[in-house]
């Protein structure tokens, strides 16, 4: 289930950063309490779901 979303908060980890307003695609669930998202550049991140807002 792929769904488009937009970040509402910044997210940082050792692989890089995602910034507020960035568009991502939700790929599905990752570990418990996290979702897997793909950025426009193709980078994959596991992030908490409360920092994204689903779009149409």
Predicted regions, residues:
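Basic/aromatic-rich interaction segments and small domains that mediate binding to polyanionic partners
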Residues: 2-56
